[in-house]
């Protein structure tokens, strides 16, 4: 079982999610832990693939908490449609997919077949507050 934290609040002028019809677009979230810690740094630098994977997994938990707050019940999720994973990477780091698997694997663990999604895993030079990852997603929900 996964304990969902209080959803992390936006850090700038945006909202956690927007519903358009039966789609929910969730803003990017990072690996913020319930105790307030964040996983910061660069993959291929001071962060290992395993640490990045765990950070992406925590990001998935944070996004699930946003979804639950918006929907009231995760059983209203019809499917995870699209995931965009941004990985704070050193110039030669090429294993972004292995990191973002921490997010994807949890979505499949929670939702089964309907957790399988289209995805991009992209290396970037920096992320807000030095986060190791930032991940956004699109979710289809029942009426």
What positions do the PLM features span?
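Short, polar/acidic, helix-capping and beta-turn segments at strand->helix junctions
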Residues: 2-143
């Amino acid at each position: 079982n996964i304990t969902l934290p209080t959803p992390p609040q936006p850090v700038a002028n945006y909202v956690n999610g927007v519903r358009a019809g039966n789609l929910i677009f969730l803003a990017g979230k990072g690996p913020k832990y319930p105790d307030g810690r964040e996983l910061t740094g660069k993959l291929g630098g001071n962060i290992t693939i395993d640490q990045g994977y765990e950070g992406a997994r925590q990001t998935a938990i944070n996004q699930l908490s946003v979804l639950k707050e918006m929907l009231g019940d995760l059983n209203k999720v019809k499917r995870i449609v699209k995931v965009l994973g941004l990985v704070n990477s050193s110039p030669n780091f090429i294993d972004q997919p292995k990191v973002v698997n921490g997010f994807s694997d949890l979505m499949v663990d929670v939702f089964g077949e309907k957790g399988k999604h289209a995805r991009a895993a992209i290396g970037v030079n920096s992320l807000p507050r030095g986060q190791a990852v930032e991940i956004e997603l699109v979710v289809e929900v029942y009426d």
